[in-house]
Amino acid sequence: MKKYVFVLQGVIFLLLTACSGLKYSFVGVDIPPDAKTVSVKSFQNNASLVNLKLSNQITTALKDKFQSQTKLNIIEARGDLQFEGEITNYSVSATAVGVDKAAMNRLTITLRVSFVNKLDETKNYEQSFSRYADYDSSKTLAQVEDELVSQICEALIDDIFSKAVGNW
């Protein structure tokens, strides 16, 4: 019995020792232990075709992602982790051509993102992220736009989040 208690104490000691001083990581997230805040500046819409709700939708979605997936506090400016960016492309193009017309159309959204990690500058990046969704050309963009934009935004936010704090 004493041997069992001794082994159990040893295992607990090793676990506590191993966990101290490490970055916390869950759901594949790797954030410096001293990071307490994140700030997200409003994404500017510089695309030639403008969706009036898109800037706010992207900015809010990125904040929501950090709020739901981390313990960081969202602040207006100068966070330990900082994001800013712009919408550089919002376009529709034909992807599959049928007899005399396009059979499928593609909505593409491209973002240019700048990320600053004040606690670990090796994680800083400036990068473009682009995602698309296809839809049947028998429908207008107005009929499918809200759903497609939501799908594309979710994928873009996942990409941005993973690039900044992903532990892959």
For each of these PLM feature ranges, what is it?
Residues 12, 43-48, 92, 134:
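A broad detector of the eukaryotic-type serine/threonine protein kinase catalytic domain
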